[in-house]
């Protein structure tokens, strides 16, 4: 298939494995630019020019899991651990709202200390502020998810990382792809807006694996999809591996937009870490969400999923004004509401 034929098939929504694999495999600048343009047009048509701002508070870097790629893994003895108090978390959320955030994202390692009741109490307090609450806390029993939904949580982000069960087990030895999927299906069933997403460039990952990720996202019609490159952390077993490729990751974002026209897709912080201006580029290739770091100092320097993370040493109230300026410079506008998924596209 020629590049033109692939683009025509994508426009006709002929999402065969062959088409997606060819789209990811072609290493041609002209094709890539046409793919990004198509994704941007679909983004504009179905989710518009608003960029939704989700202020993320990383409230604990304690984690019971031992994922091979993650700097928060429990065997990383070089990381100074922290836990924010519930009062600190709520006050930080209040400040984000004052700065204009319409969604608060609470993210942590899998830290049993807060589970489930402390999280419920925090969610209830933040919901009084009139904003959406997204949780990104990992894999927990169904009853925890139920409690948090009853407390008022609106969304849950649980990236599947890779849909290859063998690779998943190798990289995440404490758990399995099956368990991850069961959690995602439970979250959907409970009425959460549910987010998945993958890492690009994982050691041992193939183009076929990336195609499986895209087909998995399409099959389950996720409301949110976060995609970012693998970035090796020096205090993990994958320290010496190669980082994920920016352009290939960008193509995954673009194809996700084409597959899921009205889902919310962030320009992830990792994209801005491996390439200067990477988030802005991603917002021009299908993304419509940005997640400014709202973790207060000194904690923000310690939430080390990967090294070199941007926006860590800036003033800890700089990020929301910064992304608002970024959105303006792109000719877009900040979202005016909670930015939930609006189903305007009928999936075929």
Curated annotation (Swiss-Prot):
Residues 49-268 form the Radical SAM core domain. Changing residue 63 to A: Eliminates binding of one iron-sulfur cluster. Its EC number is 1.8.-.-. It is an enzyme of class 1 (oxidoreductase). It holds the Pfam family Radical_SAM. InterPro entries: Aldolase_TIM, BATS_dom, Elp3/MiaA/NifB-like_rSAM, FeFe-hyd_HydE_rSAM, HydE/PylB-like, rSAM. Keywords: 2Fe-2S, 4Fe-4S, Iron, Iron-sulfur, Metal-binding, Oxidoreductase, S-adenosyl-L-methionine. Binds 1 [4Fe-4S] cluster. The cluster is coordinated with 3 cysteines and an exchangeable S-adenosyl-L-methionine. Its cofactor is [4Fe-4S] cluster; [2Fe-2S] cluster. GO terms for molecular function: 2 iron, 2 sulfur cluster binding; 4 iron, 4 sulfur cluster binding; metal ion binding; oxidoreductase activity; transferase activity. One of its GO terms (biological process) is water-soluble vitamin biosynthetic process. Required for the maturation of the [FeFe]-hydrogenase HydA. Catalyzes the reductive cleavage of S-adenosyl-L-methionine (in vitro), suggesting it may contribute to the biosynthesis of an essential sulfur-containing ligand that binds to the hydrogenase active site [2Fe-2S] cluster. Monomer. This is [FeFe] hydrogenase maturase subunit HydE. The lineage of its organism: Bacteria, Thermotogati, Thermotogota, Thermotogae, Thermotogales.
